[in-house]
């Protein structure tokens, strides 16, 4: 069936129903309407497919086209994520500001990584090497404090048949070719894509045997947090939950911080961005942003993107975890994420 065969059947806030066949699968990414708004399939029932749209749906009407992308909702991973700020579906907000001004325009399909910036790449493999999932094939300095390690993707193993020369490359230029046991040749670059709702595989979960030093003596003494563990900060409005998370993000001894503002107030994310840019990391004496990724999905942004932003942050955090770094993921707040889930559930007419 051709792509034009899918059309909008109905619109209910961020939820759009689609007709035209049975070719769409759960979690498939689609572009909705004339402006090609980004959406994701959340229900398939008979000949009717339900899509949640991550942008404002004002102006959509029945009969407009829906274009399937043929892949699940994914984000781009590679050098350039650190020292950057993204929205809930991993679009860089600084590039969005250049293209559309202070307000986010609809239908902006912007890649997460800069296509023109070059990185000084050193190859870690040579022709004839046998490689498997998780093996390092290249590395480059991403910031002044973090070296980016490019790893063989999950599910790929084989023999290296070609490597590029060490030098400067963009995220789209091939670095290594690997031939698998079936004879297929895979070209590996600095960047790769990963579905946000698929956990990155791991061999085993290591036991928690060392503390995360948060820099807050009362937490480290009375409520210690283990590296590899989790902690929650419950409390009423105005109790200082966000300020506590800011302190943990600034001074904890993690290698990388992924700070996720899920439905937070815009001024709180602005404060975090300003402070992280000015403060120095006590270990490296470099700005804190050199080891930080900010994901800003504030309360005035579409509610569907708020739901996806948590998975975006987890995918980025797991990506750097696989490189061997200690990564601290701060999600603020879980209650507003649950609020987004409740609203989506209501739009889907679920109990």
Language model features: what each stretch is:
Residues 1-97, 101-105:
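N-terminal accessory targeting/assembly segments
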Residues 98-135, 139-154, 170-230, 244-247, ...:
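P-loop NTPase nucleotide-binding/switch module
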Residues 42-49, 79-90, 146-167, 187-200:
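Short, compositionally biased
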Residues 235-236:
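The Walker A (P-loop) glycine that initiates the GxxxxGKT/S ATP-binding motif of P-loop NTPases
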Residues 239-256, 261-262, 266-268, 275-276, ...:
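Conserved P-loop NTPase nucleotide-binding/switch module
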Residues 20, 34, 69-70, 89, ...:
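Conserved "cap/hinge" positions at secondary-structure junctions
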Residues 82, 191, 227-230, 252-257, ...:
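Short coil/turn connectors at secondary-structure junctions
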Residues 53, 58, 120-130, 160-168:
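Short histidine-centered loop motifs in beta-beta connectors
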């Amino acid at each position: 069936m051709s792509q034009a065969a899918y059309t909008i059947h109905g619109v209910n806030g961020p939820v759009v129903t689609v007709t035209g066949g049975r070719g769409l699968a759960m979690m498939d990414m689609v572009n909705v309407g004339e402006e090609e708004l980004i959406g994701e399939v959340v229900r398939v029932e008979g000949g009717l497919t339900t899509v949640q749209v991550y942008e404002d749906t004002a102006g959509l009407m029945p009969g407009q086209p829906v274009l399937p992308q043929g892949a699940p909702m994914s984000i781009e991973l590679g050098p350039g994520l650190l020292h950057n700020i993204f929205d809930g579906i991993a679009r860089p907000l600084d590039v969005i500001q250049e293209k559309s001004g202070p307000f986010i325009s609809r239908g902006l399909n912007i890649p997460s990584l800069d296509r023109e910036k070059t990185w000084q790449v050193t190859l870690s493999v040579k022709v004839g090497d046998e490689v498997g999932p998780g093996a390092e094939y290249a590395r480059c300095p991403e910031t002044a404090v973090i070296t980016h390690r490019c790893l063989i993707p999950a599910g790929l193993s084989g023999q290296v048949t070609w490597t590029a020369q060490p030098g400067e490359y963009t995220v789209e230029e091939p670095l290594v070719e690997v031939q698998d046991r079936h004879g297929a040749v895979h070209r590996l670059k600095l960047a790769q894509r990963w579905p946000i709702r698929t956990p990155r595989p791991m061999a085993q979960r290591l036991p928690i045997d060392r503390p995360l030093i948060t820099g807050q003596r009362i937490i480290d003494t009375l409520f210690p947090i283990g590296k590899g563990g989790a902690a929650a900060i419950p409390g009423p409005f105005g109790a200082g939950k966000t300020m506590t998370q800011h302190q943990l993000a600034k001074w904890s001894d993690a290698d990388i911080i992924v700070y996720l503002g899920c439905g937070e107030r815009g001024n709180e994310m602005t404060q975090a961005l300003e402070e992280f840019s000015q403060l120095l990391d006590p270990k490296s004496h470099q700005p804190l942003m050199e080891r930080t990724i900010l994901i800003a999905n504030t309360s005035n942004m579409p509610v569907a993107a708020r739901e996806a932003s948590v998975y975006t942050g987890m995918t980025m955090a797991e990506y750097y975890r696989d490189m061997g770094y200690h990564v601290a993921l701060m999600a603020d707040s879980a209650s507003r994420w649950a609020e987004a889930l409740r609203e989506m559930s209501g739009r889907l007419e679920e109990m």
